[in-house]
């Protein structure tokens, strides 16, 4: 089956993951007000539109060099750009203050001339992207089509009606990139845990935490899924934050993660979480299965 791959890219908190979730009518991708919650390029289910099988790739948002995951995110963006056919740039209408930074990022995209380009302005709380800034983006990005839509009041039919007006071309230079599958069970488990780390710990902890599934087993008689997880952080002080006083924080994280996963798995779930310090660099997620 030939698939057209659409990479969704843009500044942090522009609405990239929100858009893809709405297109799929689900919440497979994490949405948060925290910057750079998407650290890896994630592939979603096939959607049949415009007589094509379309897959949307959630790409990490542009980030500055001072960010702790700058190298990882930059690598993921480059990987995604080499493995897509269409580049969908999402910018929130109130992100006028990010225009200079965005301009430098768009200039680096000029080498990917073979990609079809679409520009989506997320009309946010009745605030407008200035005409000057819009012109800068149009000049630097040179999209085939511009879509202006409010993701808080998303009109899927309107989106597709405009999207279909674009001449969607396959990228003959596209590489066969093995993106993470949003429907992979291990991904759902790891992403579910990281979402709760973000909610409870905030600040820098979610960006430096690395998560691993150590063991996973299913008891058919009890209809019970047992999951043993490890959270690794570089410093003892960070470990103490995640565990919390009298282990209250890690208990809350575990309970919330289990509750989240019960929506994805048709069985009871037992979760055991161990927190350790690990100074060497680890992958964001370590899977049992690919």
UniProtKB/Swiss-Prot annotation:
Its main location: cytoplasm. It holds the Pfam family KH_2. Residues 2-144 form the Era-type G domain. One of its GO terms (cellular component) is plasma membrane. It is found in: Cytoplasm; Cell membrane. Residues 97-100 are annotated as: G4. GTP binds at residues 10-17, 58-62, 122-125. SUPFAM superfamilies: P-loop containing nucleoside triphosphate hydrolases, Prokaryotic type KH domain (KH-domain type II). Monomer. NCBIfam families: era (TIGR00436), small_GTP (TIGR00231). Belongs to the TRAFAC class TrmE-Era-EngA-EngB-Septin-like GTPase superfamily. Era GTPase family. This is GTPase Era. The gene is era.
């Amino acid at each position: 089956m030939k698939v057209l791959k659409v990479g969704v890219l843009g500044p942090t908190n522009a609405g990239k993951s929100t858009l893809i979730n709405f297109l799929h009518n689900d919440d497979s991708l994490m949405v948060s007000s925290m910057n750079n919650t998407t650290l890896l390029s994630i592939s979603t289910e096939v959607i049949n539109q415009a007589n094509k099988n379309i897959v949307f790739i959630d790409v990490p948002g542009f980030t500055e060099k001072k960010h702790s995951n700058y190298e990882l995110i930059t690598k993921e963006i480059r990987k995604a750009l080499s493995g897509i056919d269409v580049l969908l740039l999402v910018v929130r209408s109130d992100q006028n203050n990010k225009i200079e930074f965005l301009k430098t990022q768009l200039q680096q995209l000029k080498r990917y001339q073979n990609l079809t380009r679409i520009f989506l302005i997320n009309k946010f709380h009745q605030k407008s992207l200035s005409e000057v800034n819009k012109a800068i983006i149009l000049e630097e990005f040179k999209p085939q089509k511009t879509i202006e839509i409010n993701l808080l009041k998303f009109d899927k039919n309107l989106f597709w009606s405009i999207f279909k007006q674009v001449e969607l071309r396959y990228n003959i230079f596209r590489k066969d990139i093995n993106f993470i599958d949003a429907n992979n069970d291990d991904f759902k488990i790891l992403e579910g845990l990281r979402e709760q780390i973000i909610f409870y710990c905030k600040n820098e902890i979610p960006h430096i935490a690395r998560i691993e599934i150590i063991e996973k087993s299913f008891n058919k008689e009890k209809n019970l899924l047992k999951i043993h997880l490890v959270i690794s952080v570089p410093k003892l002080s960070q470990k103490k934050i995640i565990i919390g006083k009298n282990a209250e924080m890690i208990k809350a994280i575990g309970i919330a993660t289990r509750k989240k996963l019960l929506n994805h798995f048709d069985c009871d779930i037992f979760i055991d979480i161990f927190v350790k310090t690990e100074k060497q660099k680890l992958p964001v997620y370590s899977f049992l299965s690919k």
